[in-house]
Amino acid sequence: MDEDNLETALQTYRAQLQQVELALGAGLDASEQADLRQLQGDLKELIELTEASLLSVRKSKLLSTVDQESPAQEDAEYLAFQKAIAEEVEAPGAPCNDSETAPGSEVQPGSTSSALEEEEEDPDLEELSGAKVNAPYYSAWGTLEYHNAMVVGAEEAEDGSACVRVLYLYPTHKSLKPCPFFLEGKCRFKENCRFSHGQVVSVDELRPFQDPDLSLLQTGSACLAKHQDGLWHPARITDVDNGYYTVKFDSLLLKEAVVEGDSILPPLRTEATESSDSDTGDASDSSYARVVEPSTVDTGTCSSAFAGWEVHTRGIGSKLLVKMGYEFGKGLGRHAEGRVEPIHAVVLPRGKSLDQCAEILQKKTKRGQAGSNRPPKCRRSGSRPEGRPPPRNVFDFLNEKLQSQVPGTPDAGVDTPERRNKDMYHASKSAKQALSLQLFQTEEKIERTQRDIRGIQEALTRNTGRHNMTTAHLQEKLEGAQRQLGQLRAQEADLQRKQRKADTHRKMTEF
């Protein structure tokens, strides 16, 4: 319906609504009022829909009017833009001291031709916007891969070369996934966004778009499959049924899925087993990463210990390194500036902290240095096991006997209080734990004895003046319990004194 018909219908509906409202105010019976109220609601809803339709028609007319006026403005702006670019191109060709040319001076033919070329290239770059191409991508480990992408718009590099911004169609990780808010112009994170805002690549590096060839996919072949998160993960086809592919992802965190043909494509890098000559001669495989065969690799300065542990495994580590472009004998990294020798594994003691492990390694290092600086004779004498005592001779025996016969010197086998105190002062961790255990047991015995004493005292209170024999027996039992309590308290005080002495030594020696 056009605008006039909608306005006429809207006036008719409003007039009918006024008549219904007048009828409701006339005081009809309940059944008629219910019908009129329902009719009133329907008319209001119809009026709202008609007003919305009328508003959309008016908007479309305004937009068409603006579209008819805008081409003239766009043509003028485009001509001004081309003129500004031509001036920028002419500026580098002029001498530094003659930035302003005199009137009537001739323009060099080279600058004119370059300006014309620039004017011819700009429309081409604008035409590339929205086109599908095969664009390069450098992975995190420096491997060059070509992904199918779409051109978003033209960009200008720092050196002035022609570049375009592309968005990859088959993102394999989150940094390649296009940001949905960037496409709408609403992303607030800009360069700090986790998703891709496009990558600027040179126009010279672009290649023609390659349609995925699904005819190569069959049961058991490797592929890239689209997951629910929007990323394309490496997988392997387990079944094909009427255009539906059952895939099992390489990652154990992803479940098996059934996808259609638009959610699967061949892998970006094939598992080629051909020689390097055939790889360079085949132009169809130019979009894949270069695979270096182990048979043609020079070992260089790397030692033979590199990847030596793979004699016990399937060698998947070195195969992955080769697929990522690593060449044996060279350093790691994109420019081969990394380390060459492998990192040796060090087995650390179980249940020890990192500080304790570092201390053990330092002791081993110092012991090895001391052993290397020691003379050969001393090294042989130091090779005796630590548990074996040193050899004894006659003089050691005589010295022990003479020292034991000196008056005032305690015997080596007698455990005197002074020796006990000294040993406790230098007590080890296990001795301190045993001391704490003894103190805990003594406190439990004291509590048990105190409960027994209270029970005996209650029994004495009950039997006072009744049974003399029972009272005497309870009195004797009470005295024995009190003596035992005194001994336990003395033992507790002695253990507490030893514990304080050990704590004092620990506080004075630990910083």
From Swiss-Prot:
N-acetylmethionine modifications at: 1
Positions annotated as zinc finger (C3H1-type): 174-200
Stored SMART domains: G_patch, ZnF_C3H1
Gene Ontology biological process: negative regulation of DNA-templated transcription; negative regulation of epidermal growth factor-activated receptor activity
Compositional bias per record (Basic and acidic residues), positions renumbered to this chain: 491-511
All copies of domain G-patch, residue ranges: 313-359
Domain of life: Eukaryota
Keyword terms of this UniProt record: Acetylation, DNA-binding, Metal-binding, Nucleus, Phosphoprotein, Repressor, Transcription, Transcription regulation, Zinc, Zinc-finger
Region described as Disordered: 92-129, 266-291, 363-393, 490-511
Disulfide-linked positions: none
Composition bias, Polar residues: 98-115
Locations listed in the record: Nucleus
Record's keyword annotation contains Metal-binding: yes
Record CDD domains: Tudor_ZGPAT (cd20384)
Subunit structure: Interacts with CHD4/Mi-2; the interaction is direct.
Protein name per Swiss-Prot or TrEMBL: Zinc finger CCCH-type with G patch domain-containing protein
